[in-house]
Amino acid sequence: ICAAIAAARHGSSVALIHSRPVLGGNSSSEIRVWTRGATGGGNLFAEEMGILGELKLANQYRNPEGNPILWDAILLDAVLMEPNITLYLNTFVSQVEASEGHIKTIQALEIISERKLTFSSTLFVDATGDGFVAASCGMEYIIGKEDSSTHQEANASIEFDPTTQGCTILMNTVKKDHIVPFIAPVFAYSLEHIERLLNNGGRIVCEKSNGCDFWWVEFGGQQDTINSIASIAFELKKLIFGIYNYIKNSGKFDAGNLDLSWVGSLPGKRESRRFKTEYMLTGNDVIAGKTFDDVAFYGGWYLDFHPSEGIYSKTDFCTQIPVSLYGIPLRCLYSSQFDNILLCGRILGATHVAFASTRIMDTCALSGQAAGTAAWFLVSQGKKTKALAEASVYRKIQSILEEDDMLLPGHFPTDSGEEITFIPSSVITSLPGKELGLLALDQDFFLALPVSLAKVSSLILDSEQKTDLQLEVSYSMLPSRNSYSKDKESFRKSLGQGRTTLSLMPFCKGEGYLLLVVKQHTGISVAICDQALSGVVCGYTASATYYNPLLDIDSFAGFGAQNLNNGYTRPYGGANIWLSSQEEVPSIKIVLPKKRKVSSLTFFFDCNLSEEMVSSRVQDVDPHHNIYLRYGVSPTLVRDFEIFAHIDGKEVLLRQVKDNFQRHVDVLVGPVATDLLFVRFLSTFGAKNTGVFEIRVH
């Protein structure tokens, strides 16, 4: 979806061919796996944006309950709104005609109509999950786990292992107001069989288990997840119905009123082919956060390993190693030996170890936008895939991706070259809210904020007695609560009794973001605030529930209008946001160096990039997911605003935007000739201060 939309928006004519009746792959209502990514891995301010961000924000606004059927509709809406996309659902690609590294045509069957279709194109993007198109044209691939000597990966198998991660079928249940009997189908596994599988390695059920709680009902990793998928699906059906029968009829659960509302028919597949591309991302790259000149998107989910035996394993159902945000190069999406095909999704060029992180859906979606943008650029310039290795080509693609709200770790934006002056009506001068309460340090606590802000800030604490605090400090461009730098420095600080402040200035020896970890200490609490200060967050290192620290701040100069054209559209090395005071109608005056034609303005608003926006949800989420499910639109997002221009001595209204729910907003206003624009921000979704990362004038 993201590849098709990216290419279409930039001007390509796109045929989107999908074998299923609904869009969304593993996140669709057919399979119902929720979308997760870098934020779910503990990275802060790291929620994936771009086209995926648009889809997620639309889902938060229109589908706050996380109904997977409505998620399907949001995806379909997004595709159908693009005039350059022709959508082919229920269409299975059956044959690829290719020679000498060039695809000529692909043949497909529209299953419900029996139409045989032939597609010819200048360029193809394979987002099939199994890589059918790429494999059919002869691109080399790997199935299984490389040995540790191949890429010197510490987490790799000692010897080559042909097994993979398995597949899963989920189920949904509902609670009724009456007893609902259940007689298991004959094919379901017996209560005895299921009991032998449960309660090992975290495989625990209860009457509240629902939806993605059953992700560990996994099978097929020791089989061929492509050619044996039908038998794998049947085994999973036997398991999932057997597990439901166990919950209902074993007598161990209060499940009399429980009713089965849905069971998947199509397995959610984790792994099959991985292709050998121009560069193979390794686990070492992921752990080190290696920088790439041709970085095109990013990941940040754990190195998340599942035993290939799946539910039949006696070991833990997964092993998750936290990683910080890492970039992924464009070279992972193509092989120069094939001149007109790009890859995206879980088939991209990565070792099995790196794949344990890159396979997650949010990362796959970002790879789609990168591939779609690159595809359009190559076609528009009459170039082949090998041109993507040229600096002049990938730098242009990078600038386009950044314009389209894609974060490229390690790539720093260039100056636009135009001297535009932004004059705000106000700048924040005090914390947005008031004290909410205290957060006890009964486990390790973290505070993340820009070093520039930390230099003028103190953390407010309460201590029952005089004591010493154990602290750890690290620095990064974008922090993670559970994967902080190996170069961390340890401190010991004395604390007085009662309400006290801890100056952060002594810890500011690095640049970018400061991550301060206060080790568990009974009798000490941190004061928290009821309103967010953009670019600042705190919480427990082991929890995805975050808080707003109550800070004593000497200066808010870092939240001025200088951020509106510094090139950064989210927290990265700093807060990078203008925050108004709590005035009724904050505004920005935009002064151009000379009168010129203005056609549009682009805004990047604050939607709270530290809280996950998943595609679907259930009412009760098992704590082992370690996820905070936000409801609806972030209070910090700008909702209503107006744009004016100074024309012939008068202030003229160009556009009113009402009920905006997007972060990246392009507003057409012209063309109009002017050298002075005004933007008035009429309301947010609840925040008292208006926040804007970037404004661009086109």
Model-derived segments and their meaning:
Residues 26, 102-105, 112-453, 466-498, ...:
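Flavin (FAD/FMN)-binding glycine-rich loop and adjacent Rossmann-like elements that form
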Residues 444-483, 523-533, 569-653, 659-698:
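Aromatic, loop-rich ligand-recognition surfaces of beta-strand-rich domains
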